[in-house]
Amino acid sequence: MVIIDSLSFYRPFWICMRLLVPTFFKDSSRPVQLYVVLLHILVTLWFPLHLLLHLLLLPSTAEFFKNLTMSLTCVACSLKHVAHLYHLPQIVEIESLIEQLDTFIASEQEHRYYRDHVHCHARRFTRCLYISFGMIYALFLFGVFVQVISGNWELLYPAYFPFDLESNRFLGAVALGYQVFSMLVEGFQGLGNDTYTPLTLCLLAGHVHLWSIRMGQLGYFDDETVVNHQRLLDYIEQHKLLVRFHNLVSRTISEVQLVQLGGCGATLCIIVSYMLFFVGDTISLVYYLVFFGVVCVQLFPSCYFASEVAEELERLPYAIFSSRWYDQSRDHRFDLLIFTQLTLGNRGWIIKAGGLIELNLNAFFATLKMAYSLFAVVVRAKGI
């Protein structure tokens, strides 16, 4: 059998975390601490703030939409990053649970399901995410390169700085460099943010289904009754790990997904409005089209895999009664009956964004409807 290693999918996430918060990994020297503090003050805090402050200066309509598009994206990115930093200890515990659950995959049917569904979906999602991030940052850096070689030192995004950029070319170059650097750091934050939730929900749904396969096969092999009863007790212990897994996931992604749903809906509306009314050059049009796709890629996988988790939890009682429980000992049947009653409560487990919005495909379509409604308001306000 092939060795299962689900944690390999998290390597890019931890690479981002090592770049952004090396102090979490016991690297607590004074220069490293100073690096982390400055990075989060200058980028996580000040970058979205200096974009938002520009909105108070009453810019033109085109500047307002261009600024607001990036402002909302960066505010959401910073908030999600801070939420992930707060939950890093729980994320480490989740990884230890995944590592334990991987060791329980034994039969050919389980390996086949893991290979064809869990591993395939996780790999497809991560590749799609990395390609989309790569495309948008390739276009971003190409646009910066074209701007610099043409001698244009204007800011990438209209923003507030406490000094006059027009009268001092050097300060203008510093401000432009700051925005480019901040966008690259925000890219690492965004990659970490958008990798974790869908990937973890995918693995949770997969391991719940794999447990159902094991449970459904119980009693169909030529084993003694005592052996089957012990296996039932082992599966109950595995179920406890799944319960802990589910609880930790619900807690660690709650705030992140609330920001995701609200931020994506507003950002999609503003991107479409800006493209229709203000984008004139081809590079910007392609950039914002890819940006629109990236925002959708951010939102859809989390909702899709959350729906899969809910469906797998609904099927747990059926998986238990699919086992050959009727040929087992009285103790086996009694334990299974009590256990089934407990799992019926799983059907009420719902992963919610911020404890308010149920996370599933309905939430994804509701967000798109919200974006369309906001866009309709903009169109009506423009008199089109």
Swiss-Prot record:
One of its GO terms (cellular component) is membrane. Residues 57-63, 150-169, 273-274, 380-384 are extracellular. Disulfide bonds: none annotated. The chain crosses the membrane at residues 36-56, 64-84, 129-149, 170-190, 252-272, 275-295, 359-379. InterPro entries: 7tm6_olfct_rcpt (IPR004117). It comes from the Eukaryota. Keywords: Cell membrane, Membrane, Olfaction, Receptor, Sensory transduction, Transducer, Transmembrane, Transmembrane helix. It is found in: Cell membrane. Expressed in the antenna and in a subset of 18 olfactory receptor neurons in the maxillary palp. GO terms for molecular function: ionotropic olfactory receptor activity; odorant binding; olfactory receptor activity. Residues 1-35, 85-128, 191-251, 296-358 are cytoplasmic. GO terms for biological process: detection of chemical stimulus involved in sensory perception of smell; sensory perception of smell; signal transduction. It is a multi-pass membrane protein. Belongs to the insect chemoreceptor superfamily. Heteromeric odorant receptor channel (TC 1.A.69) family. Or2a subfamily. The atypical heteromeric and topological design of the odorant receptors appears to be an insect-specific solution for odor recognition, making the OR/Orco complex an attractive target for the development of highly selective insect repellents to disrupt olfactory-mediated host-seeking behaviors of insect disease vectors. Odor-evoked OR currents are independent of known G-protein-coupled second messenger pathways. PANTHER family: ODORANT RECEPTOR, ODORANT RECEPTOR 19A-RELATED. Odorant receptor which mediates acceptance or avoidance behavior, depending on its substrates. The odorant receptor repertoire encodes a large collection of odor stimuli that vary widely in identity, intensity, and duration. May form a complex with Orco to form odorant-sensing units, providing sensitive and prolonged odorant signaling and calcium permeability. Interacts with Orco. Complexes exist early in the endomembrane system in olfactory sensory neurons (OSNs), coupling these complexes to the conserved ciliary trafficking pathway. This is Odorant receptor 33c. It comes from Drosophila melanogaster. The lineage of its organism: Eukaryota, Metazoa, Ecdysozoa, Arthropoda, Hexapoda.
